[in-house]
Amino acid sequence: MEHRSKMEFFQKLGYSQEDVVRVLGKLGDSALVNDVLQELIQTGSRPRAQEDPASGTGVVLIPRGCCGVQDSAQQGPGTRPRRGWRRSSPLLRPIVIDGSNVAMSHGNKEAFSCRGIRLAVDWFTDRGHTYIKVFVPSWRKEPSRSDTPIREQHVLEELERQAVLVYTPSRKVNGKRVVCYDDRYIVKVAYEKDGIIVSNDNYRDLQNENPEWKWFIEQRLLMFSFVNDRFMPPDDPLGRRGPTLSNFLSKKPRPPEPSWQHCPYGKKCTYGVKCRFYHPERPHHGQLSVADELRAKTRAWLGGGAEEPRTPSARSRPTTARLLPQEPGEHDLPPAPQPAVLAALNRSFARLTFSDTAASGVVSQSRGPDWMPTGVPTSWAPPSLRAGSAATIGLPGMRSLRTPNNPLSPGDLGSPICPQARLSERHRSRDMHSDLPPQRRPLEDPWALLPSSYCYLNHSVWSESAWGEDIFRGPSESAQPVANGGGTRPVHCSFFPPDQDHPVMASGPPLSDMALLTLLQRSQKTGAPLGDP
């Protein structure tokens, strides 16, 4: 850099030509710029703007920190502090300043320093607050005394002319000063304006006086500190977990800015919405936890192309839901039979006769009247099978004759095998289904769920053609199809092996009453129902 260019450069920085020539003569024209600046600083040279602030050519640099304004000692008598560098905003809360507390805090509790009030007012004015009120007792306008020193009292006059300062009333009575309670003015005006109280006083007496004021003072009190001539309110007026100073002074606080620090776990993070770090892979959708994401994916998968589930209780309905929860006991009992089926059963069993001495093998030929009219009775009590035992069996037990798996119809009951033979076959097939649960055993035989007292029917009853209008056939009529191996062979072959089925089919007449009684007694000794599979 040439000598001339260096001279112009340092003169633009504000140094005088004499100082620059002196330093360059000492260090030489080939000296570096940093070395020249260091020498100028060490020799005490300063720019002209700082040496002569009152000159018209100098530029006064005003700091933009919290102080915001030059001290009153550095300002000229006619100069006003620079305010309003931020545009006024109606969203800022009104400010009510406790003038006595602020002035005494700035005077270090020794003097009433009016400069502290000016610094506080200028700080809020620079932030853009338009409503600022300072309350000071009126006796502070009196001349300063040794017991009550007042500094820079002219500041109060300036603030009063600007309609910022308000004097609270006070007077003298019999030579004694009567002062009104200025704190009540401060709290009342701030409460009505929904503003901020600037003071280091807690106003405990006023908190106990009014519960509404208690909450307001706790939430709207702004404390402060003075660092030399710098007014410094805290950045967190209500504590570390409270709002920031900007939100505290605003009517509509802004939400906190999100943290842009990337999560150290990246895509492997399992905190979900609770993670306080930034995830760039989740910019356009809400952050969900892992469990919520799995639930959402499961719902979408079931609702999109899932097949309609089916319930395991209905074999005849393949489209019933399987995965849907079932109510307890919903499929434990079979559905009630239709009224027409009950009426047909009542007509069919109206001619049954029972033996009171069936255990001895003597069968009674007597026949009772039609004691079960059509559609009327729903429960009945059969005769006692043994001495001292009487069982009441209800007709609703017959509902098991019609189930979703085996509906009762005349075609199903029209089997060429007599009921005694079918009962014998059911007893022989008990071992085949003993390992199945009770509710899952096959119900292909409607005689399987009949009470055991049906086994003691008179032999002549089965031979009557009026029984069920040929629905059930007697032993004499069923012997012919059995011997011929008619329509019963497919039924037997489906449940019994051929080596057991052929001898039974070729034995001629069906089982006698004595054989049937022996089978029934054996079933009763084991304790299992006769028709239980």
Curated annotation (Swiss-Prot):
Report domain RNase NYN positions.
92-246
Look up the record and name the cofactor or cofactors this protein needs. Mg(2+)
GO term, biological process aspect, one? T cell proliferation
Here the disulfide bonds are none
Renumbered zinc finger spans (C3H1-type): 251-282
Q: Which PROSITE patterns match?
A: ZF_C3H1
Alphabetical keyword list = Cytoplasm, Endonuclease, Hydrolase, Magnesium, Metal-binding, Nuclease, Zinc, Zinc-finger
The Swiss-Prot or TrEMBL record annotates one GO molecular function as: endonuclease activity
Say which enzyme class the record assigns.
hydrolase
Signal peptide residues are none
Could you tell me where this protein is found in the cell? Cytoplasm; Cytoplasm, P-body
Which stretches does the entry tag as region Necessary for interaction with ZC3H12A? 262-368
EC number(s) recorded for this UniProt protein: 3.1.-.-
Q: What is the annotated tissue distribution of the protein whose record heads this document?
A: Expressed at low levels in bone marrow derived macrophages.
Region (Disordered) residue spans = 302-335
Listed GO cellular component terms? Answer: cytoplasm; P-body
What this protein is reported to do is described as:
May regulate cell growth likely by suppressing RB1 phosphorylation. May function as RNase and regulate the levels of target RNA species (Potential). In association with ZC3H12A enhances the degradation of interleukin IL-6 mRNA level in activated macrophages. Serve as a tumor suppressor in certain leukemia cells. Overexpression inhibits the G1 to S phase progression through suppression of RB1 phosphorylation.
Q: Which family does it belong to?
A: Belongs to the ZC3H12 family.
Q: How does it assemble?
A: Interacts with ZC3H12A.
Instruction: Report what the protein is called.
Output: Probable ribonuclease ZC3H12D
State the taxonomy lineage.
Answer: Eukaryota, Metazoa, Chordata, Craniata, Vertebrata
